[in-house]
Amino acid sequence: GIDGLVERLIGMFAFAIWDVRKKRLTIVRDRVGIKPVYFTRAGGRFIFGSEIKAILSDKSVPRAVNGTAIAHYLSFMVAPAPLTMFRGIFKLPAGHIMEIEADGRARARRYWDALPGRSGIQNELVGLSDAAARDYLSKEVLKRLETAIDRRMMSDVPFGVFLSGGIDSSANVALMSRIADQRIKTFTVGFSDHTHLNELDYAEKVAKHFN
């Protein structure tokens, strides 16, 4: 079924499947919501797409501002899912599946949660001392980072990394240089008038060390 399918998928994705036999449309968004999915109802139809402008191209869809979403954006700099800036147009939350039946009934459900009740890693920590737990977690984090970076370096076009000088991007560069068989291209932005924000010196040291 669809749950078994999404459990095996890795990376960013958004897709729709039409089940001819069950007359059911299933829409899925990736775990952390990198790929967007928007939807609305208008003119007795269910309309969806990866961009809001695609939905607005349908003349039956009204163009009206969503006041609640605007308030959220002005307060928190984000319009939380399922809200969008347009009234009546919604976005499918990350890690969710939506099923739409032929009679118009629809339901969305979460298929992935970043904070499960008890994960496999939590089970592994049972009975370990603090030192042993730290050692296990550090090795597990490194292993997963290496796996994630290795998968994202599979590309048919040239790629690089944005290097800010912070711990996260520096770790990415370090692991990429270990995996790649070529020099890693790094890109950094510096500030001449905001010296407290400027990490150019740190980024340069990292780039020289690994390249």
Residues covered by each model-derived region:
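Cysteine-centered catalytic environments shared across enzyme families
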Residues: 1-211
